[in-house]
Amino acid sequence: MDPWISTQPSLSLDLRVGLPATAAVAMVKPKVLVEEDFFHQQPLKKDPEVAALEAELKRMGAENRQLSEMLAAVAAKYEALQSQFSDMVTASANNGGGGGNNPSSTSEGGSVSPSRKRKSESLDDSPPPPPPPHPHAAPHHMHVMPGAAAAGYADQTECTSGEPCKRIREECKPKISKLYVHADPSDLSLVVKDGYQWRKYGQKVTKDNPCPRAYFRCSFAPACPVKKKVQRSAEDNTILVATYEGEHNHGQPPPPLQSAAQNSDGSGKSAGKPPHAPAAAPPAPVVPHRQHEPVVVNGEQQAAAASEMIRRNLAEQMAMTLTRDPSFKAALVTALSGRILELSPTKD
């Protein structure tokens, strides 16, 4: 083979397949891979929006940590206050429920807080309130009153504890009672005769009952707070339902003297019958006198009490009317001044 042919790679007729050529092996050079650090050589330019977001994120993280610390401090203070409150409630319950032998409440470790100690000492040193003087009370009654005052103080201690005073709220609610009376369905007056004097001040129809409801106020005394609502029953229109709210602050009016009148009429009729009637013979003169004398006396007392109560209510109504009149004071001052001038001595 000619040398110029062997030098041409395209015209090489070398038949050594799979065997490395010496010239080719000598000419191969190892490749060196060079890793270039592009991040350090050429730093990336940050977007101003990204920088602003990173700053905002850092600020929010710092604020979140600060809020977490504040929340932990508040939770610790709340737990401390809750424990103190529970201790105070327990101590007040023990003092009010009969724990008077222990002068001051102690904590779990056995130590007494200074504020509670001072409070208990002041309560122990303070004398009980003196009993109200009573001119007709016996001397031995005076020794019982301090105990009653101590019991009242214990009740006040129980009421001022953490438990709600339900009894006070129940006493503030007006007393409600109902009365059922049979009445004629054709009677539309809605009047229930219960012995008191009432003044009607309103009437309306409710949703649950087609019959109207009437509203009354007690007019027997000016300051009586009792109200009455009268309405027919929705199930039976022959029944009137009277609902009373409150309690009367006066006595019940005396009933009419029908029994005394009936007894007097009966005695007159029995005296006027003929003597030959066997069943209606008149009794002895002394027996009717003994029977009717208490009734007459009782009727006189009731009439006197009724007239006294009517005069008292009339005086109260007149006083209220005069005090509400704005011109009453001016007229009273004028009358008094004129009377004083008339009675004053005049100098000659």
Swiss-Prot record:
Residues 50-84 form a coiled coil. GO terms for molecular function: DNA-binding transcription factor activity; promoter-specific chromatin binding; sequence-specific DNA binding. SMART domains: WRKY. Residues 267-348 are annotated as: Transcription repression of gibberellic acid (GA)-induced promoters. Gene3D superfamilies: WRKY domain. Disruption phenotype: Impaired repression activity on gibberellic acid (GA)-induced promoters. A motif (Nuclear localization signal) lies at residues 116-122. Induction: Induced by biotic elicitors (e.g. fungal chitin oligosaccharide and fungal cerebroside elicitors) and pathogen infection (e.g. the compatible pathogenic fungus M.grisea race 007, M. grisea crabgrass BR29). Accumulates in response to M.oryzae. Triggered by defense signaling molecules, such as salicylic acid (SA), methyl jasmonate (MeJA), 1-aminocyclo-propane-1-carboxylic acid (ACC), wounding and pathogen infection (e.g. X.oryzae). Repressed by gibberellic acid (GA) (at protein level). Induced by abscisic acid (ABA) in aleurone cells, roots and leaves. InterPro entries: WRKY_dom, WRKY_dom_sf, WRKY_plant. Residues 126-136, 275-286 have a biased composition (Pro residues). The keyword Coiled coil applies. The WRKY domain (213-266) is required to bind DNA. The C-terminal region (267-348) is required for the repressing activity on gibberellic acid (GA)-induced promoters. This is WRKY transcription factor WRKY71.
